Regions:
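Short, surface-exposed loop or secondary-structure junction motifs
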Residues: 34, 45, 97-209
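Structural motif detector for alpha-helix initiation sites
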Residues: 60, 83-84, 91, 104, ...
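Short, conserved catalytic-motif segment at the N-terminal edge
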Residues: 1-60, 80-82, 137
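Short, glycine/proline-biased beta-turn/loop segments that scaffold the active-site neighborhood
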Residues: 83-97, 183
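Short, conserved phosphate/pyrophosphate- and ester-handling motifs at nucleotide-, phospho-/glycolipid
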Residues: 65
C-alpha cells in the first residue's frame, strides 16, 4: 500500500462528499499487480447512517460492459461465438423486424442500431430473457454497422442473452466460470445472491443531484 497516495485519494473522496454532493465512495487502485490505493469515505445507507467500508458492495452499472465483452472474447476464442456471425445464429427470434444481419461485432462496437429499449422502464428489467423479448420485437434505428451510438441500456442484453443461448447457461453462471472464478473475484455478480449477509453489505441506491 502506498500510504501517501492512499491519503491523497482519501482527501479527494472526502472533498467530493463535502462539495459535490456525493454520498459514499470507495476506490481501489493497482499498479503492476500491487494494491497501492484502498480507501473509502461517506455512508452506504443515508437512512441508517451505515458507513462505507472496504467490504461495501456497489452496483457497477455500465462497468459490467467490460466484463460482458471479456466473456464474449473468451467464447470467441473457443469457437462458441464468432465476431462476424449474426446474433440470430444462437438467438433465432432476434432476427425479426430486420435484425438478422446484426453480428456480435456490431453489438460489441455499439453499431447494432438498437441503442435503447422501447416501452420498457428501467424498473421493468428483471432478466435477460425479459429484456431480450423486448429486443426481439424491436426494429433497428439504422442498418447494422451504418452508424454508431452508445448502447447504454441494450449492450448487456444483446450480448448477455446471446451468451446465455450459445452456452445454454444462465449469464451469472458463465460470469463465474469465465471471469470471477478464474480471476478469484468473489464479490462480483450479475444479480445479488440471496444470502442476507451479502445484502447487508450493499450500498443503497438513491436519486442523484
Amino acid at each position: 500500500m502506498n500510504v501517501s497516495a492512499n491519503g491523497s485519494v482519501y482527501d479527494a473522496l472526502t472533498k467530493a462528499i463535502a462539495t459535490l454532493g456525493e454520498t459514499g465512495l470507495q476506490v481501489a487502485a493497482y499498479h503492476l499487480g500491487e494494491l497501492v490505493v484502498d480507501t473509502w469515505a461517506g455512508v452506504a445507507d443515508p437512512e441508517t447512517g451505515r458507513a462505507v467500508d472496504g467490504d461495501t458492495l456497489f452496483t457497477v452499472f455500465s462497468m459490467s460492459k467490460g466484463v460482458t465483452a471479456t466473456i464474449t472474447h473468451r467464447l470467441v476464442e473457443r469457437g462458441i461465438l464468432a465476431y462476424d456471425e449474426p446474433l440470430a445464429t444462437w438467438w433465432p427470434a432476434f432476427a425479426a423486424h430486420g435484425k438478422g444481419g446484426i453480428t456480435v461485432r456490431h453489438a460489441l462496437s455499439h453499431r447494432a442500431g438498437l441503442p435503447g429499449f422501447k416501452g420498457l422502464a428501467f424498473a421493468d428489467q428483471p432478466s435477460l430473457a425479459a429484456t431480450g423479448r423486448n429486443l426481439e420485437e424491436a426494429t433497428p434505428d439504422w442498418a447494422p454497422g451504418a452508424s454508431m451510438a452508445y448502447h447504454g441500456m441494450t449492450f448487456g442484453t444483446l450480448l448477455g442473452r446471446t451468451i446465455e443461448l450459445a452456452t445454454g447457461k444462465p449469464f451469472a453462471q458463465v460470469l463465474h466460470e469465465e471471469v470471477t472464478g478464474p480471476a478469484n473475484i468473489p464479490d462480483l455478480w450479475c444479480g445479488i445472491p440471496a444470502d442476507p449477509s451479502i445484502h447487508a453489505r450493499v450500498a443503497t441506491l438513491h436519486p442523484g443531484n
